[in-house]
């Protein structure tokens, strides 16, 4: 009996081990294939997104570079107008448009293509209202800058430039929405081409006028407005003139329904991105209010601009991740989701604490009491960023992903039912 019982398990265990090895090898091959497929999908969105962000971000950099040929005051004024005033509204509107990234991605994944055009128009309405509410920042830029302690000459000139940058501010309404509308459908190559065209046109315009004509900061602002609208026009024509036949069916009154739900979805993201965007710009205001010279302000603006170039790369991957998650959620593939947990409000709180409780106060202390000057402000900024990164990493590690995936899928189902009911009525 013992010999019989010993022989049989040996044969069975050998067979079972062989099967387990085969299964393990199959799972490994499947994992590699799925990973490679997902990497290609991510890069399909991330590549053009990174190039587009770098191109559009470079428009302001080019403007500042050519403004540097004028004088220190002009450069300081246009630096404050572009890196502080417009960047505040940039963060708010970019955050509001992020709701479209989620909705369009989910609708595309669920093959509800007709809803993408509705969401796009709904986004235009909400962002247009938001942009109008933000106009006082441009109109009253001079007194606002004076209240923050900026030199009077710089504040006056920066206020003038800010007024002339209102057209660029309004272009954000359509630019951000169109980009997310196209990204949600994986139509990303056109975004890169149009952004590259706007960059080339802007560079040529600045070179031409700098070489053959003497233009001031107002002329530089006008060229910046024009280049942003070139990008908007290119994307708009592609979207409505046949590039998106499945998702664009013309203008619809459905765009005016569900506006409050759209606003609620975008509010937390708007605050989150605005806090992060304004953080780097508030250092410029602090530098001016603490008695630093125009040259110091220029140097800090250039550092922040250079940092902005670098951060466009992870922002591109962020956009790609958001699109892929939304596509999988819309298709009902909750198992493929490891993001999109609706943490915008929590991240906004983390940003508020790490940036404005740690970063800015520490920078001021190092600048004022330790005599580090601009280096102190920069060190404070980096410290706030480190605190933010560590805090978010801890939150991510402790996340219960299975629970978050189920909750995310539940939200998709509710949203789909709500949208379908709206269309039926």
Segments predicted by a language model, with ranges:
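Interfacial segments at transmembrane-helix termini and the short loops linking adjacent helices
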Residues: 33, 145-165, 259, 290-298, ...
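Membrane-interface helix-loop junctions in multi-pass transport and translocation proteins
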Residues: 32-39, 188-233, 237, 295, ...
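Alpha-helical transmembrane segments of multi-pass membrane proteins
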Residues: 88-89, 136-140, 152-178, 193-194, ...
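Interhelical loop/hinge segments that connect adjacent transmembrane helices in multipass membrane
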Residues: 2-46, 190, 213-217, 221-227, ...
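Interfacial/gating helices of multi-pass transporter permease domains
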Residues: 42-45, 66-86, 110, 114-115, ...
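Helix-loop interface residues and adjacent transmembrane-helix termini in multi-pass membrane transporters
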Residues: 61, 69-72, 107-110, 184-185, ...
């Amino acid at each position: 009996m013992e010999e019989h019982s010993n022989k049989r398990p040996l044969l069975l265990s050998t067979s079972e081990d062989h099967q387990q090895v085969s299964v393990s090898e199959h799972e490994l091959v499947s994992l590699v294939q799925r990973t490679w497929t997902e990497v290609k999908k991510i890069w399909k969105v991330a590549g053009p997104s990174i190039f587009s962000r770098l191109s559009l971000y470079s428009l302001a950099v080019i403007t500042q570079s050519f403004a540097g040929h004028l004088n220190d005051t002009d450069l300081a004024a246009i630096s404050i107008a572009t890196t502080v005033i417009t960047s505040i509204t940039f963060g708010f509107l970019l955050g509001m448009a992020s709701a479209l990234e989620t909705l369009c991605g989910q609708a595309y994944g669920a093959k509800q293509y007709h809803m993408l055009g509705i969401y796009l128009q709904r986004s235009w309405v909400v962002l247009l209202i938001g942009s109008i509410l933000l106009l006082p920042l441009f109109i009253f830029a001079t007194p606002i800058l004076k209240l923050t302690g900026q030199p009077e000459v710089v504040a006056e000139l920066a206020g003038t430039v800010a007024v002339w940058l209102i057209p660029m501010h309004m272009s954000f309404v359509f630019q951000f929405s169109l980009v997310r509308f196209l990204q949600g459908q994986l139509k990303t190559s056109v975004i890169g081409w149009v952004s590259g065209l706007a960059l080339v046109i802007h560079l040529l315009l600045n070179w031409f006028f700098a070489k053959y004509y003497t233009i001031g900061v107002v002329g530089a602002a006008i060229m910046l407005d024009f280049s942003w609208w070139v990008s908007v026009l290119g994307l708009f024509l592609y979207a409505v003139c046949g590039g998106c036949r499945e998702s664009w069916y013309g203008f619809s009154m459905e765009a005016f329904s569900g506006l409050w739900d759209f606003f609620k979805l975008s509010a937390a993201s708007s605050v989150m991105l605005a806090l992060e965007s304004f953080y780097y710009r508030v250092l410029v205001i602090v530098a001016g209010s603490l008695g630093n010279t125009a040259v110091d302000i220029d140097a800090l603006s250039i550092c922040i601009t250079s940092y902005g170039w670098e951060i466009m790369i992870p922002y591109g991957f962020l956009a790609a991740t958001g699109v892929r998650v939304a596509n999988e959620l819309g298709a009902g593939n909750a198992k493929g989701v490891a993001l999109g947990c609706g943490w915008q409000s929590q991240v906004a709180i983390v940003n508020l604490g790490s940036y404005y409780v740690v970063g800015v106060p520490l920078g001021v202390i190092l600048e004022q009491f330790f005599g580090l000057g601009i280096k102190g402000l920069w060190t404070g900024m980096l410290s706030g960023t480190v605190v933010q990164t560590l805090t978010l990493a801890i939150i991510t590690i402790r996340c219960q992903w299975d629970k978050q995936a189920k909750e995310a899928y539940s939200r998709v189902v509710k949203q789909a039912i709500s949208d379908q009911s709206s269309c039926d009525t």
